[in-house]
Amino acid sequence: MDAFETDDLVAAQHRPGEHTYTDFLRRETLSLGMSVWPAGGEDTQRPHTEDEVYVVMAGRGRITVAGEDRSVGAGSVVYVATGVEHRFHSVEEDLQVLVLWAPPYRSRAGASASGEAAGR
């Protein structure tokens, strides 16, 4: 069985004031990661080559997806389709976000390592 505690995932990657991302599960059809954006931090990600589902576990901020903006906090779930512009912003409290990728992150040919690595 693969089982994880999000608190442990966050603690293992914690670097105060920095955005961090860790892949922790990868299968043929999907992958999971934990991303943390610090309060006041900047999200510099670019569109990805995979669909994403963000599940906000803790914190508060805002997200813009394809020009549509909304607030997010613990319990928010946001779907982002392949290739769509999206960005977290106005982070008031460190955002801890579970990220589901389908297919797995960077699994599609031609994925831009330089563009995607910055923001996941």
Place the predicted regions along the sequence by residue.
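Structural motif
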Residues: R27, V53, R60-R62, V65-G67, D69, E85, ...
